[in-house]
From Swiss-Prot:
GO molecular-function terms, A-Z: manganese ion binding
Function: May play a role in plant defense. Probably has no oxalate oxidase activity even if the active site is conserved.
Subunit comment: Oligomer (believed to be a pentamer but probably hexamer).
Name this protein carries in UniProt: Germin-like protein subfamily 3 member 2
Lineage, broadest ranks: Eukaryota, Viridiplantae, Streptophyta, Embryophyta, Tracheophyta
PANTHER family reported in the protein's UniProt record: GERMIN-LIKE PROTEIN SUBFAMILY 3 MEMBER 3
Location of the Cupin type-1 domain: 68-213
Residue positions binding Mn(2+): 115, 117, 122, 161
Record Pfam families: Cupin_1
Length: 227
């Protein structure tokens, strides 16, 4: 009996080790911490690097490991959606630790459009409200439900996911990602705001040139600023 128990414990430890190794997204740190010198690149900028120069340890303070920016919502867009991304650029203590966060607030009826993080898995915790949340796997199967306060959902790395507030109050979600530079690509902007050939888009979606033009005006940052 003791031998079986010992075997199970060893197997469990090995499984945990393999899972942790497999899920690791960023390089392991080679020191206790590396508080970066001030930078300006946002956490979802693909140019953001873990190879940032570190402060001298004599300059590091407790405040480098404390972040208060999730207490309040970010600035709401016209569509009723607000985010507060949290990475090494505004929470220095996260640098080299392979993790980042985001607070998302959705007014009733508003959405976080389909998007994905190419370099990270995300775990979303619904702090307040009722939110229809889910993701789509590589077989185009949707896994979605209406989440209640206190529930969590995981969005596997690289899979498209989304949220919509189906409640009567502003919903708040806090997400954790296993990379300090997870990246983000919003599907509407990727398709219609990146400059893909219009003829290709017409054939892919069965839309007219006029319809494609309307969508590009909405999602292309250059064209939207001209109108």
């Amino acid at each position: 009996m003791e031998a079986n128990t010992l075997f199970l414990l060893k197997a469990l430890c090995l499984l945990c080790f393999n899972v942790c190794f497999t899920l690791a997204s960023d390089p392991d740190p080679i020191q206790d911490f590396c508080i970066p010198k001030p930078v300006t690149s946002p956490y979802h900028d693909h140019h953001f690097s873990t190879n940032l120069p570190c402060k001298n340890s004599s300059e590091v303070t407790t405040e480098d490991f404390v972040f208060s920016g999730l207490k309040t919502a970010g600035n709401f867009t016209e569509t009723g959606f607000a985010t507060v991304p949290v990475g090494p650029e505004n929470f220095p203590g996260l640098n080299t630790l392979g993790i980042s966060f985001v607070r998302a607030d959705l007014k009733p009826g508003s959405i976080n459009p389909p998007h994905y993080h190419p370099r990270a898995t995300e775990v979303a915790h619904l702090v307040k409200g009722r939110v229809y949340s889910g993701f789509v796997d590589s077989n185009n199967k949707v896994y979605a439900k209406v989440m209640e306060e206190g529930e969590m959902m995981v969005y596997p790395k690289g899979l498209v996911h989304f949220q919509m507030n189906v409640g009567d109050v502003t919903a708040t979600i806090v997400g954790g990602l296993n990379s300090q530079n997870p990246g983000i690509q919003k599907i509407p902007s990727v398709v219609f705001g990146s400059g893909i050939n219009e003829e290709l888009l017409m054939k892919a979606f069965g839309l007219s040139l006029k319809q494609i033009g309307t969508l590009k005006k909405r999602f292309d940052p250059v064209m939207s600023n001209e109108h």
